[in-house]
């Protein structure tokens, strides 16, 4: 099993190109099931989760071709995928594939919308909280789907097709919004999604669906209106830049010191995180190529943050911020409101010498003057990269184990950091 070895203490200087957003690429790939024409997606990141979803879609009969780089593409330019779901041969998504990634459960929506039936295994993925699919099931039932659970599978049928409805989520749910949005595009009549998630990735998917002929308004607001259409056609769409990757590298620079240009980043996608970084002592400069992050001389200031749905501080940057705050001059407080059990990285950060205490959903981080390298183990995707951030500033050597979590969500992480002066290498086997 691969590991990452890091010798801490180097400041970061240079340019890091930001990849396409995983959290947009996955639902965009799934949305290709809605049409029998080809969907072309540009700037798709090369990630383990993307490769897994290609296998899952292939199981349904989807043909996916990865195109080569075009003239002028950057070295890290995301891949272009040509996705054709002309012939869906199977409406079952098996346990052995779906159990590896929760987002793959979302195939239930386009399969129902287009084929009027689906049998999908209950999902897997990062072990963060329970993440029940109840809200997704509720949304589908509102659209006229008959559902049952049999031997770990959700068996769903809509013999007469989906019918437009008003769906009001009791709490904001990104997964539920994605599922309702995709399903409603081919439903008969009008669908209103109330208390919808406002994340940029939702808007990106809606933009792509509209290019395919959907009639969606209000994406990016709590109220989305979908006028169902009979058919969607092919389209070409570029995946938006990854705001979580952007925030992660910004926090790495704030941790080590130095100055890095985050090329292709879009500041409006993570303004809350940039505001927190400014409070922590980083200098943020917006320019034509993205975002420049620097911390020169000044120490790290403590912050108090509560995670919240967009446009609030993203839960997917909580672990990275906690790593940064281990070196702050004073006590920081981070409250996690999105997922339960999302403090699994605390005990691993403690191995560096971090001082962190937990009280319910709030973590108090008492900054220390130095961290020391240690062998650590990744527990989930975002926690794993928080260990990398800590290691970059720690004295001595750190070995990060179980890095398959990193490969799920960060494209060429060690290459990007190494190019900016970090001493970091992947050790195979």
Swiss-Prot record:
Question: Which reactions does this protein catalyse?
Answer: phosphoenolpyruvate + UDP-N-acetyl-alpha-D-glucosamine = UDP-N-acetyl-3-O-(1-carboxyvinyl)-alpha-D-glucosamine + phosphate
The record's InterPro entries line, in alphabetical order, gives:
Enolpyruvate_Tfrase_dom (IPR001986), Enolpyruvate_Tfrase_sf (IPR036968), MurA_subfamily (IPR050068), RNA3'P_cycl/enolpyr_Trfase_a/b (IPR013792), UDP_GlcNAc_COvinyl_MurA (IPR005750)
Q: What is the lineage of its organism?
A: Bacteria, Pseudomonadati, Pseudomonadota, Alphaproteobacteria, Hyphomicrobiales
Q: Does the keyword DNA-binding apply?
A: no
Q: Where in the cell is it found?
A: Cytoplasm
Name the principal localization, coarsely classed. cytoplasm
* GO biological process terms on file: cell division; cell wall organization; peptidoglycan biosynthetic process; regulation of cell shape; UDP-N-acetylgalactosamine biosynthetic process
* First-tier enzyme category under EC: transferase
Q: What is its EC number?
A: 2.5.1.7
Read off the Gene3D superfamilies from this record.
Enolpyruvate transferase domain (3.65.10.10)
Family according to the record: Belongs to the EPSP synthase family. MurA subfamily.
The protein's matches in SUPFAM superfamilies, at most eight in alphabetical order, are given as:
EPT/RTPC-like
Keywords associated with the record: Cell cycle, Cell division, Cell shape, Cell wall biogenesis/degradation, Cytoplasm, Peptidoglycan synthesis, Pyruvate, Transferase
Where does this protein hold UDP-N-acetyl-alpha-D-glucosamine? 102, 131-135, 316, 338
Functionally, this protein is described as follows: Cell wall formation. Adds enolpyruvyl to UDP-N-acetylglucosamine.
Q: Where is the active site?
A: 126 (proton donor)
Positions modified as 2-(S-cysteinyl)pyruvic acid O-phosphothioketal?
126
Q: Which organism is it from?
A: Rhodopseudomonas palustris (strain HaA2)
Q: In which pathway does it act?
A: Cell wall biogenesis; peptidoglycan biosynthesis
Q: What is this protein called?
A: UDP-N-acetylglucosamine 1-carboxyvinyltransferase
One annotated GO molecular function is:
UDP-N-acetylglucosamine 1-carboxyvinyltransferase activity
* An annotated GO cellular component: cytoplasm
Q: Which residues bind phosphoenolpyruvate?
A: 22-23
Check the record and name the PANTHER family matching this protein: UDP-N-ACETYLGLUCOSAMINE 1-CARBOXYVINYLTRANSFERASE
């Amino acid at each position: 099993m691969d590991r990452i070895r890091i010798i801490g203490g180097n400041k970061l200087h240079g340019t890091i190109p930001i990849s396409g957003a995983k959290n947009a690429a996955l639902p965009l790939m799934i949305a290709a099931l809605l049409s029998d024409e080809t969907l072309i997606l540009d700037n798709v990141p090369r990630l383990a989760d993307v490769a897994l979803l290609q296998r899952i879609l292939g199981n349904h009969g989807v043909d996916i071709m990865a195109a080569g780089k075009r003239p002028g593409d950057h070295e890290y330019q995301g891949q272009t995928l040509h996705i054709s779901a002309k012939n869906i041969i199977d409406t079952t998504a098996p346990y052995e594939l779906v159990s590896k990634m929760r987002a793959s459960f979302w195939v239930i929506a386009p399969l129902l919308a287009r084929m009027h039936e689906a049998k999908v295994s209950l999902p897997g993925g990062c072990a963060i909280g329970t993440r029940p699919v109840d809200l997704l099931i509720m949304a589908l039932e509102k659209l006229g789907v008959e559902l049952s659970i049999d031997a770990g599978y959700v068996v769903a049928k809509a013999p007469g097709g989906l019918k437009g409805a008003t769906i009001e989520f009791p709490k904001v749910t990104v997964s539920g919004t994605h599922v309702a949005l995709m399903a409603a595009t081919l439903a008969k009549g009008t669908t209103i999604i109330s208390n919808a998630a406002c994340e940029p990735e939702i808007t990106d998917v809606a933009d792509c669906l509209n290019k395919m002929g959907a009639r969606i308004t209000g994406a990016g607001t709590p109220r989305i209106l979908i006028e169902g259409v009979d058919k969607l056609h092919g389209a070409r769409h570029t995946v938006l830049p990854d705001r979580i990757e952007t925030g992660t590298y910004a926090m790495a620079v704030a941790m080590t010191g130095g100055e890095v240009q985050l090329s292709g980043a879009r500041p409006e996608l993570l303004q809350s995180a940039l505001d927190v970084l400014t409070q922590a002592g980083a200098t943020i400069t917006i320019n034509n190529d993205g975002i420049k992050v620097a911390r020169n001389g000044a120490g790290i200031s403590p912050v108090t943050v509560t995670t919240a749905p967009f446009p609030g501080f993203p839960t997917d940057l909580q672990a990275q911020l906690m790593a940064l705050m281990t070196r702050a001059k004073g006590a920081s407080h981070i409250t996690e409101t999105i997922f339960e059990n999302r403090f699994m990285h605390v005990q691993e950060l403690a191995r560096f010498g971090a001082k962190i205490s937990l009280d319910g959903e709030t973590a108090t981080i008492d900054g220390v003057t130095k961290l020391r390298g240690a062998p650590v183990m990744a527990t989930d995707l975002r926690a794993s990269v928080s260990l990398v951030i800590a290691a970059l500033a720690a004295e001595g050597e750190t070995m990060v184990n179980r890095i398959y979590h990193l490969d799920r969500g960060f494209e060429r992480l060690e290459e990007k950091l190494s190019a900016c002066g970090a001493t970091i290498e992947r050790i195979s086997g």
